[in-house]
Amino acid sequence: MQAKYSSGAPSETVPKHRIRPTVRALQRASAFQSPRLPLYNLPVRVLLLNLYYPPDTSATAKMAQTVVAALAEKHDVTVLCGRPSYDPAERRPWRLYQSEQSGRVRILRVGSSDYPRTQMKKRVFNYLSYVFLSVPRALFLPCDVILAMTDPPFEGIVGAFGALLKNKPYVYNIRDLYPDMAVGGSIVKPGLLARVWEKLHRWALRRATRVVVLGDDMRNRILAKDVDPAKVVVVRDGAEIAPVAAPAPPLDSEVIRAIRGDFRFVLLHAGNLGFYGAWDTLLSGAASLADDGVGLVFVGDGAQRLRLETAAAQIPNVRFLPFFPGNKVSSVLAAADAHIITIKRGLEGVVVPSKMYGILAAGKPIVAVAPRECDVASLGEAKGFSISPDPDDPAGFAQLVRQLSQNPARLRQMGQASLAAAPEYERSAELRKLVNILEKAATSGPHRK
């Protein structure tokens, strides 16, 4: 078949196979060069991919809900998630797909398995069943941009694959960096699986229109994977900052008493007891602080809790408590003299604990048992709100904590530094950055590298 052009000159017959490449080239060029409508005049349709979403209580579920609320102020959001699996009381009957609508937000749950997360094999089955059902469903969901988070740990690869099939831009919001986390946390052994996973992950990073990370330390990790620096953006989780004139929330004396007990000085780790922490350094250091009236209290749960409880059975100044309800967070934060944030060596930039921002907003000092390359250590020392014991030195940790516990003036200075730093990481400002990234990605056309 032949086609004809007419441009005022004598007509010329051109083979069709020569037209098609030209058209495709023009389409590619127009995706980046054509004038666009103002970004904020039209709603954007966002497809968010994450296995967990409330009522699940994982960190990614809570953050996904926060991001969705910010997006839904102006945009239409579809959340493609799995069945709840955290709380047995929230389990739901199996259906292939279940849909809920709330304003501009549609929550579409695929019929993934909901095994308890305590056994790794069953957790992996939850992951795979979610991917098996979510990918084909995503192909038929209208959207302008895909936002992929990191549950399951290979969700970024799933997002890149879906974006490729749908010919849509995609933003990769990395909460924990995999497979680095799995290998560094001894969940996956170095070998063929890790190498294939890493290769696919690097492909997903290159395909992303933007890669959103939680800190400068994580950004450095991503850049080391040969990703274009222009596309890697830091958006911190931040914390809600109460107005200066707002009254302080009432504190629950029972919560405070449960945490403090009879200790003179309380170091508190509140959060997940996962594979990333320098837990043995904490326990060994705490044992040498028993005669100083210093208590180490863990509030929370996680894969390492049973091992830690067993290891601490003979350490009298170490205590484990379950999570408190969400409305008691201010009391939990207030109960401590200083808060622990820990990352073991080798995982700097792989995991970025977002609890730092809530601690800052509460005006509490931080003991960052982490490599100095970590944001919590480097920022904390620069701004004066943290001390940073070596994560491999229990004696050094104990010495710094002992000195801090005997120096009320230093504690006050660090607490004041925390309050001064907190507004720099105000959550609504960070969320606006993420919304802006998604708006721009949606109007830029698909990424074609």
Regions found by a protein language model. Name each.
Residues 39-101, 449:
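N-terminal subdomain of nucleotide-sugar transferases
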Residues 135, 142, 154-157, 161-165, ...:
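Membrane-proximal helix-turn-helix segments that form the acceptor-binding/catalytic region
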Residues 277, 325-334, 339-360, 365-378:
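Nucleotide-sugar-dependent
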Residues 83, 217, 238:
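Carbohydrate-associated surface elements
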Residues 92-98, 244-260:
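A short helix/loop element that forms part of the nucleotide-sugar donor recognition site in Leloir-type
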Residues 258-277, 283-286, 297:
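Conserved donor-binding/catalytic core segment of Leloir-type glycosyltransferases
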Residues 250, 392, 396, 409-438:
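A charged, aromatic-enriched C-terminal amphipathic alpha-helix characteristic of glycosyltransferases
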Residues 291-297, 305-330:
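Nucleotide-activated donor-binding/catalytic signature segment of Leloir-type glycosyltransferases, i.e.
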